[in-house]
Curated annotation (Swiss-Prot):
InterPro entries: Ly-6/neurotoxin-like_GPI-ap, LY6_UPA_recep-like, Snake_toxin-like_sf, Toxin/TOLIP. The lineage of its organism: Eukaryota, Metazoa, Chordata, Craniata, Vertebrata. Disulfide bonds join 23-48, 26-35, 41-69, 73-89, 90-95. This is Lymphocyte antigen 6E. Residues 99-126 form a propeptide. Expressed by thymic blast cells. It comes from Gallus gallus (Chicken). One of its GO terms (biological process) is lymphoid progenitor cell differentiation. It is a lipid-anchor; GPI-anchor. Residues 1-20 form the signal peptide. One of its GO terms (cellular component) is cell surface.
Length: 126
């Protein structure tokens, strides 16, 4: 009986843990609410990734959100004031529920862009 229990214990310890990472997935969505479809990642995909791109000029703005599984973790971000892009990654169950948190608006650059737009429009009327 002890030999059987020892064999079962050895088998359990030697078996690799099953890959069960599940991430939210979407492509080019305009809202985070459209990105709530869970998918099971492939064995080599160990990270959930969220890619965010946002643009705002004057009173018009737009954004694109993509989510999914990835074998690498490419966290990065850039903020140019009127445009921003970021990639956020994590590695736990449904961890990419939110949009990327690394993008922050630069209100000074946005205000400067709006001011330059107004000056351009006013000069175009002359």
């Amino acid at each position: 009986m002890k030999a059987f229990l020892f064999a079962v214990l050895a088998a359990v310890l030697c078996v690799e843990r099953a890959h069960t990472l599940i991430c939210f997935s979407c492509s080019d969505a305009s809202s985070n609410w459209a990105c709530l479809t869970p998918v099971k990642c492939a064995e080599n995909e160990e990270h959930c990734v969220t890619t965010y791109v946002g643009v705002g000029i004057g009173g018009k703005s737009g954004q694109s959100i993509s989510k999914g599984c990835s074998p690498v973790c490419p966290s990065a971000g850039i903020n140019l004031g009127i445009a921003a892009a970021s990639v956020y990654c994590c590695d736990s169950f449904l961890c990419n529920i939110s949009g990327s948190s690394s993008v922050k608006a630069s209100y000074a650059v946005l205000a400067l862009g709006i001011l330059v737009s107004f000056v351009y429009v006013l000069r175009a009327r002359e």
